Amino acid sequence: MDIDIDKLDFQLDWPIIGRLKDEFYPYEGYDHIRYTARGLIENSRGQFVFLHIEGEDLFGMRDHLETCGGGLEENEAVDDALIREVREELGHEVHGLELIGSIVDTYNLIHRITLSTFFHGYIDDRDIPMHRTEEEEILIKEIVCLDPLAALDRLEHQAVHAVDKLVQRRDALALRCYLKYKGLL
């Protein structure tokens, strides 16, 4: 089965803010769609919080920033998925969720189309226990907090490996959209 990204209609009640095609790995068709929730999470100092991912996996070497988030579990609402992911990956409660929109992107190496729905939200300084997966424990090097424009610059201009570019361009698109909406660009 091959799915055409340009013909997909997800029938969402919110906008698709971008469609990004994988230009880094050979195209061999797509056989599944993954639905994710992702967060532009802001701390009490007005900085955006990212996961610094470092290591090696199927995609090769990685060293990139990534928004908090992940796949929806069965029968899970997209906002509930983000609340869960923030707890698991950052060890914080998130509040004030504001829907930004969705990005459709492709991952040729794993034959996947992903619909990532982005929210903006806030965390406070109170920690709660994290519950990272084994893979997250290995790949998440640290939590990085950056001012909005520094975050955008790093996402857009500091990616070395192909997978870094795939991930950071998605997150940069969401951040740029949010900052424009807020009049900060």
Tell what function each PLM region has.
Residues 2-39, 44:
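Acidic, metal-coordinating catalytic segment for phosphate/diphosphate chemistry
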Residues 34, 62-67, 94, 114-116:
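Short connector loops at helix/strand junctions that flank enzyme active sites
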Residues 42-48, 56, 73, 120-128:
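Short, charged/polar surface micro-motifs in flexible loops or helix N-caps
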Residues 47-88:
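Conserved Nudix-box catalytic region and its N-terminal flanking loop in Nudix hydrolases
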Residues 93-101:
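A short coil-to-beta-strand element that immediately follows conserved catalytic motifs
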Residues 105-130, 144:
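Active-site-adjacent beta-strand/loop module that shapes the phosphate/pyrophosphate-binding cleft
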